[in-house]
A protein has these predicted regions:
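Substrate/cofactor-recognition hotspot
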Residues: 147
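Short, exposed "boundary/linker" segments that immediately precede the start
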Residues: 1-6
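Cys-dependent protein tyrosine phosphatase-like superfamily
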Residues: 8-141, 154-263
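Short cysteine clusters
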Residues: 144
Length: 263
């Protein structure tokens, strides 16, 4: 079984049974996504080692890596590729959503963040996709802290470039809510308590608008990733144009990626 961390179970990026619109089967066991890895021990660490990971592609900022460094793994290359600015846009958004002195934000703001990955921050992701589409680095695991926002965006783009239809890609993205169900429930309680303390009220008195913001932060929503996919369509018109002109992935690199992942 996939190993579990205290934050997010590892997931093979490509679930068994995924197919492209051309009817090709997507291979599993080559790309994985996860949250932070430092808490793994015992059987979970053994399971991670059994995956034969060759490359870890870390999307976190240096401060996140320092707080939760990678475990020692023999023969594994760690590629640091922070996709966040020093201001860490998502953390700023998260803090604003939970700040009692600010206007409550909601799911639309996270969807706008995802769209901005394509319209405003794509340059930070180009090296990520260049690495993730290199079969010479497989098996490859890419991770962030929560394993759902930065990695969820990358996973969705990788699948759509392969030709998996949008509905299936969104279904795959939403699995993060399933595998993180217990963790989400625990964090919702913590968020409610934190908001209550900051407002000077009891947990049962927290306004629904604040709880909506909390749930939006902790859960995946189809509208989040769809916003990014729509931005690709709006800006480039096709996945081939986006791959070539937006991400700068050459025809030869993309052909090698397809050959490795499709059967």
């Amino acid at each position: 079984r996939p190993p579990r961390s205290t934050l997010l179970p590892y997931t093979t990026l490509f679930r068994s049974g995924l197919t492209t619109t051309e009817g090709l089967r997507v291979r599993t066991g080559l790309l994985f996504r996860a949250g932070y890895l430092c808490d793994l021990d015992g059987p979970d660490r053994d399971a991670l080692d059994s995956l034969g990971i060759r490359t870890i592609l870390d999307l976190r900022r240096p401060t996140e890596v320092a707080a939760r460094p990678h475990p020692e793994m023999d023969g594994v290359e760690i590629v640091q590729a922070s996709v966040s600015s020093d201001d860490n846009e998502f953390a700023v958004l998260a803090n604003a959503m939970l700040d009692p002195d600010s206007e409550p934000l909601g799911p639309d703001h996270i969807a706008a963040y995802f769209r901005g990955n394509v319209t405003d921050r794509l340059d930070r992701y180009r090296s990520v996709f260049e690495t993730a589409t290199d079969p010479g680095r497989y098996p490859l695991l890419f991770n962030c802290t929560a394993g759902k926002d930065r990695t969820g965006f990358v996973a969705g783009i990788l699948l759509r470039m392969l030709g998996v239809d949008e509905r299936t890609v969104l279904d795959d993205y939403m699995l993060s809510n399933v595998v993180r169900r217990e963790w989400i429930a625990e964090r919702e309680v913590e968020h409610r308590q934190r908001i209550a303390e900051s407002l000077g009220i009891g947990p049962d008195e927290v306004p629904e608008t604040r709880l909506v913001a909390s749930r939006a932060l902790l859960n995946c929503a189809r509208s989040f990733l769809r916003a990014a996919l729509d931005a690709v369509h709006d800006g480039w018109g096709s996945w081939e144009a986006f791959r070539r002109d937006g991400l700068g992935i050459s025809d030869d690199r993309f052909a090698a990626y397809r050959d490795a992942l499709l059967a």
